[in-house]
Structure formats: C-alpha cells, structure tokens
A protein has these predicted regions:
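N-terminal interaction/assembly modules
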Residues: 1-167, 171-189
Length: 189
C-alpha cells in the first residue's frame, strides 16, 4: 500500500502543486442539528455579540471625539440615532461613551500608573480609547462584565483596529491594571 498523502495532482502546466499546509490532524466532525452548537474556547470572542458591537461603536465615537474636536453631544446623539444598530447596542455604546468621558479624570491616571513609560496623551488614539473603555468596564460594569471578558474584548478590539502590536500592548497594560480588581471566580474559591 502506498502513501497517498504526498501525491499531488499536476496543475494545468504539468507541475505538481505543493502539499496543503496544516497541522496534520483531521478536523473533528460535529453533529449538526438541535443542541449541537460548537462551544466557544477559552478567550474566544463572538464578533457579532451585542456587547462587542457596542464596544466597537463606543471606540469609534471616542476616537472621533479625541481626534476631530466634534462636540460630545453631537457624537452622542448620532450614536443614539444610528438606525443600523439594534437598540441594545446603541444603549451600551452610549453608556460606555458617556461613562468614559464623564470619568476620564479617574480612568487616565489608572492607565498612566500601569504604563508609566507611555504618557496617556501620547498613546495611539485607538490604544488609549480601548484602554479607557476596558478600565471603565472594570470599574463600573463588573456586575455584568467579568474581568476576563473586559480584558479579552479590549485585546481583540485593539488587534482589529490598532497597530500591529496594539493587542500585546493593551494586554500588558490591562494585565497590570487587573491586579487592582479581584476576579470574582478566584474570590469565590
């Protein structure tokens, strides 16, 4: 019996195509049907979740506020009237946007203490505002947003909207900040 795994079909020019790359493990087969939804792994973020959309919308609003000088009320009104978003997304995005701006005087020092080599005003606008949203959630949304979720969401959003190393930077800063907030899971043990 021969090993067919390295036998490649010639392409139109008669050349052999390279072997497909992969981990060599077959994908697990999941049953389809009622109750067979795949489980999310540790650290997975569902990109279409309501809260994820709200955080993204809040980031865009904070970014606009930071860089354009548009009025806070103008941005907030537009945020609340975005018909493309469900009301739950608009409501939570507005909570984050207004909460971050209201509490900037207490949020920015937390970030500055965790990253003393990087003055908050000099941080990239995306990184700065992702961190602000995460710190706001850690301080004021702990009943509905677990510590790990706030951190993982911030990292994912930083990866999606920030520079190449934004995810790592946000992860490091929030790792330091998170020590100030005991994790409910660990506290319950």
């Amino acid at each position: 019996m021969t090993d067919d795994t390295n036998d490649h079909t010639p392409n139109a020019n008669g050349e052999r195509a390279p072997a497909p790359r992969g981990r060599g493990k077959p994908k697990s087969k999941r049953r389809k049907g009622k109750g067979s939804r795949p489980m999310a792994g540790k650290g997975d973020v569902t990109p279409t979740s309501t809260r994820h959309q709200a955080r993204t919308l809040a980031l865009q609003a904070l970014y606009e506020y930071d860089l354009t000088g548009h009025e806070r009320d103008e941005i907030g009104t537009r945020l609340l009237n975005d018909e493309d978003m469900p009301p739950s997304v608009r409501d939570y995005a507005s909570t984050l946007f207004e909460g971050v701006l209201r509490d900037l005087a207490e949020i920015d020092p937390v970030i500055a203490e965790a990253a003393p080599a990087f003055p908050v005003p000099q941080l990239a606008a995306v990184d700065r505002n992702v961190l602000r949203i995460a710190v706001y959630e850690l301080k004021h949304q702990r009943k509905t947003v677990p510590l790990r979720v706030a951190i993982n969401e911030a990292i994912e959003i930083a990866k999606n909207f920030g520079a190449e190393n934004s995810g790592r930077f946000v992860h490091g800063v929030l790792g330091t900040i998170s020590r100030q907030f005991p994790d409910e899971e660990q506290a319950a043990r």
